[in-house]
Every structure is written in structure tokens, then in C-alpha cells.
């Protein structure tokens, strides 16, 4: 294994959304490409908002996508004693100090700065206190460099980024209740876990110079950084629930395949020539963080749907059958209780289905004979014609020796030639008889899947229905 160590560090305050999943994917790909280590860390320091339900949802989403981790999951709340040790170290070395300013005082300072046209920042009131007030609540602030210099870091995606030190105020590293803050915890965790490359969303860019200063103050090596551009909705606003589903598990429940979502996410910001389709192994082999663009990506549901249809069309029928069972059971169908083999039925549906939900709806007629028929479609044909078609087809099928879809299709061509009918004049009525509607696989495929006996019975029931009209 290489020395590359990366991490995905979600906050358990909600589900695993597509933006987080893409960040996890990029970290996972870099680790697998370099033979490195992928670590899962749960950043649960926000005790009030963090829930076990969210942790479970994140792990479930990761597992569904196949983003296996090598170490973890680790929880930040388990490290509180360690954080306190390092905060005390900063205090002992004069690199941090206690700040006794009240919330009201800080708000007044902020309002004054805004009024005077200055960027709001802490003014260092408590930075050089010689006496510590007794029995007053305090926060601990990091003593940021005030030498007029700058803090820079090289971003693997955005290039060199520099922040003037006079724009960075003294960061709070410990709240008044004694809990450490995010920016401090993440530095300690990444340092202790020996993270070499931090890949995360570019909403963290402004946190980075503060974190770099903390690494340096504590004597830790500074990792490499790669800030991934955000994902936008079709209106160019940041992707959110109002743009549709954003939860990874929601896409699973809507019938998307994990490989389709992975393929789509990897192309949101990363490219390899004009290639669109990538297997998991191809992603690992071709991924390079330097090929991630700097501009935001727009989430396109239609493109994801196209990819999903591709993977369904080319998927293994038996695997798809296993995935389809829960969707069928939600519709009251258990393929184990009778009907055609599900994998056989799926072969007739793969060409047209875009999601597993669509496939489940399309498969229902194989397991439940139609209880009603598309009257609008039937009305396009004269009653006498329908009765003639059903009688002729039932008779021909009873005597037929055909066993393959192609042979049954040939039989229908013979019927058309013999009767002077065009194929739609036979195919549509028969498709309605077998499935209840006009949107179904080819006639030959349906007959092979249902079996000749079931096919004839359904045609006879349709004939009886037409006779009563």
C-alpha cells in the first residue's frame, strides 16, 4: 500500500446527499487508484443535531454505492479528551488565550465594524489580558499570526490560494461550554489519522487558511488540499431539495442502480476525454484529481436517467431480478409464488426500462392476468375484427410447435399473410389481451415468457370480454 491516506468526514445531521456522495467517491477513487487508505470519520461534535438515524443513513448510502472504507467509522465525540489536551497545549505555549467577551459585546463590535465599512472580525480585546476575570464564562481563541504576512496553500484543483493574515481573526477553538469547534477538531483528527490529502467541497476553502495556521502552530505536517466545486441545480442555484431528490437512498428507492449513480457523480466535475460510460474498474484506473474542473457542475436528472437505462439494458438479468423483487412485493407480487422466472421476464423488459420502478410496473402483467383492458386502444378496431384475430391466434397457437420468440414472430407473419392483415392489426389486439395495454415487449417475447398455455387462456378471456361489449 502507498502512504496516501484520505478521508470522508460527513456530519450526521441528515442523509447522505449527492454532493457528499461525490466527495466520498473522489476520495475513494484516489485511495483505490494509489493503493492508499480510505477512512470514514463521523463528525458528530454538533451534539444537538447529530442523530444515530443520520449515521445509519450515511453508512447505508455508502454501502449501497459500494464505497467500502478501510478504517472507521471513527466518531469525533470519542476524541473530546484528546482535543482538550491540544487546546491546553496551545494555551500553555501562548498560542491560544481565553476570551471573556460576551455575545452582546461581540455583536456591538460587529455592528460598529459594519457601520464604519470594515470587515467584521474580532478585535483582540482579550488577546493580551494580564489578569483573568474570575467566575466569568470564556471561550478559547487561537492566537492567529498578526505579522502582516499571508497564509497560502496549494490546492490540487484551484492552484495556489493566499489569504492575507490581517483578514483572519482569532478563531474560537473551544466554546464556553467546553466543547471544541469544528475547525479545531478537524485539524487534530486529520493530523492524528495522518491524512495526506483532504478532498472536500469548496465551501471549505475559507476554513483552510485557519486550519493551516493551526497545523503549523501545533507542529503537524500540513496535508494537501483539493476543493471540489459545488453541484448546482438547473437554475444555477446550489443543489437542494427543491431541485428534486438529493438523497442517495432516495435514488435507490426510485429504482436507480448504484453503478449508474456512481458513473453520473464521477462525471460531475471530472472528465476523461469525451468518455461518458465508466465501469467501477475504469473509474479507478482513469481517475486523476488534477482532471477535476474548477467550475461548478449542473445536476441533470435526464442524464442520470439515461445512464440508468444504459446500465439496466446491459445488466445481468439475474442480478436485476434480485433487485426487482422488493419493488414487485411493494406492488403485491411475489415472483416466488408462481409465474415466469423473473430473470426470464426481465430479459424482455431491459430494453425499455429506465428505472427499476418502471421495470416493476412493466413486469406486473406477467404475474397478474389483466383484469381490465385499454378500451381506447381496443376501440380502434372493429368488434368483428378483434373476435376474428383472437379466434385465429388461439387456434394457430394451439397447433404451433414454435418455442422461440423468433418462431412465434414468424407465426404471426404467417397469420397476417394468410388473412391479409397488417402486423399492427394483429399485434396490438394480442398485446392488449396479454398485458392489458399497448406498452409491452414484443409478442414473441411475451408468449415465450408466459408460456403457450397461459397465452391462449388470456386471449380467450379477452375474446370473451369483447363479445360482451
Swiss-Prot record:
Cofactor stoichiometry and binding remark: Binds 1 zinc ion per subunit.
Catalysed reactions, as listed in the record: tRNA(Glu) + L-glutamate + ATP = L-glutamyl-tRNA(Glu) + AMP + diphosphate
Main location (coarse class): cytoplasm
PROSITE patterns, per the entry: AA_TRNA_LIGASE_I
Range of residues in the leader sequence: none
GO cellular component: cytosol
Compartment(s): Cytoplasm
Annotated InterPro entries: aa-tRNA-synth_I_cd-bd, aa-tRNA-synth_I_codon-bd_sub2, aa-tRNA-synth_I_CS, aa_tRNA-synth_I_cd-bd_sf, Glu-tRNA-ligase_bac/mito, Glu/Gln-tRNA-synth, Glu/Gln-tRNA-synth_Ib_cat-dom, GluQ/Sye
SUPFAM superfamilies: An anticodon-binding domain of class I aminoacyl-tRNA synthetases, Nucleotidylyl transferase
Residues at which ATP binds: 241
EC top class, as a word: ligase
Gene3D superfamilies attached to this UniProt entry: 1.10.10.350, HUPs
Reported function: Catalyzes the attachment of glutamate to tRNA(Glu) in a two-step reaction: glutamate is first activated by ATP to form Glu-AMP and then transferred to the acceptor end of tRNA(Glu).
Quaternary state and interactors: Monomer.
The name this protein goes by in its record: Glutamate--tRNA ligase
Organism field: Pelobacter propionicus (strain DSM 2379 / NBRC 103807 / OttBd1)
Gene this protein is translated from: gltX
